[in-house]
């Protein structure tokens, strides 16, 4: 395996709860109104220090999307997913953006969203936007 290069973020950021690797800046939050199977999730315009899994079509609360799960590049922990393609016209704004599950990341003030509220049947991507 080659040398691992990490992007260091300047400013308030969200990081992996397992290894504290920077994942996204607070300034890159698009929406805090998303829901995942474990509870709250935030939509970000830019996420760093992650690698993507296999593309798959997934039916979510807002319709069919092509997504990839994303993992921390340092420790390999699942942290959320990235939207590759939205089938519905009104969901196109999500393309290229990533969702981080709050219970999988540390917040900018060092807190973690520990409450895992189970949501029925698969992934959710409800938002108020």
Curated annotation (Swiss-Prot):
Q: Which UniProt keywords apply?
A: Metal-binding, Zinc
GO molecular function terms attached to this record: metal ion binding
The chain positions of domain Yippee read 12-109
UniProt cross-references to InterPro entries, sorted A to Z = Yippee, Yippee/Mis18/Cereblon, Yippee_fam
| SS bond partners | none
**A Pfam family name for this chain?**
Yippee-Mis18
State the superkingdom.
Answer: Eukaryota
**Binding-site positions, Zn(2+):** 16, 19, 72, 75
Family as reported in the entry's similarity comment: Belongs to the yippee family.
Q: What's this protein's name?
A: Protein yippee-like At3g11230
């Amino acid at each position: 395996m080659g040398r691992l290069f990490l992007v260091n973020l300047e400013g308030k950021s969200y990081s992996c709860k397992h290894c504290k690797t920077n994942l996204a800046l607070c300034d890159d939050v698009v929406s805090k109104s998303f829901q995942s199977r474990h509870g709250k999730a935030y939509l970000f315009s830019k996420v760093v220090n992650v690698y993507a899994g296999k593309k798959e079509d997934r039916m979510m609360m807002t319709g069919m999307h092509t997504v990839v799960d994303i993992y921390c590049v340092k420790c390999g922990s699942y942290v959320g997913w990235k939207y590759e393609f939205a089938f519905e016209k009104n969901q196109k704004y999500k393309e290229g953006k990533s969702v981080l599950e709050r219970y999988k990341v540390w917040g900018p003030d060092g807190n973690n969203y520990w409450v895992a509220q189970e949501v029925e049947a698969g992934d959710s991507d409800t938002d108020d936007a």
